[in-house]
Amino acid sequence: KRCLLVSYLPISGTNSKLVIVNLHLEAYDSGEGKAAQTRMLADILQNEAAAGNYVIAGGDFNQTFSNVDLSAYPQQSADLWAPGSIDVSEFGDSFTCITDSSAPTCRSLDKPYEGHDHESFQYYVIDGFIVSSNLQINSTETINLDFKNSDHNPIRLDVALK
């Protein structure tokens, strides 16, 4: 139902590639689909890193990373969709799961956003990146556009090759 787009970019002067995985994982399932997609993603990332490539996976995980403090975005109601959690240890020591929770990356779609009381709205941090250890993470930033264009805010990652 959802997808991964894997792109390979050559790195001049090396046999390695920068592997970019753009993703949108399952949201509305009982959990088995998300778990299977996460395992498949982990396998792809680990295989690419083992081949000596630089790897970044990023997008809408429709899950939260287990290493992120989400206390600023409590579940407002049991009636609203709640994301699952990705245990970041599933990706091993060769990867970092990272996002920026200083602003929400997503909002609920249960009611119109414009003109709504933003204090009682449901927010999530379900977008982010998984980065291989041969890349230096300089920064990650959620750009708070107040959901002007989408139900997601963009998130930016700045990395350098080690």
Set out the residue ranges of the language-model regions.
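Extracellular/periplasmic catalytic domains that process cell-envelope and extracellular macromolecules
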Residues: K1, S12-N15, A49-A50, S120-Y124, ...
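Active-site metal-binding loops of divalent metal-dependent hydrolases
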Residues: L23-L25, G59-F61, N153
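Solvent-exposed loop/turn segments connecting transmembrane beta-strands
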Residues: S30-G33, F147-D151
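Active-site beta-strand termini and strand-to-loop segments that position acidic
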Residues: V6-G13, V131-S133, S150, L157-K162
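Short beta-strand micro-motifs in enzyme catalytic cores
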Residues: C3-L5, V19, G128, N153-I155
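Metal-dependent phosphoesterases centered on the DNase I-like endonuclease/exonuclease/phosphatase
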Residues: S30-N134
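Structured beta-strand-rich core segments of catalytic domains in phosphoester-bond hydrolases
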Residues: K1-K17, L23-L25, I143
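Low-complexity, intrinsically disordered Gly/Pro/Thr-rich segments
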Residues: L135-L145
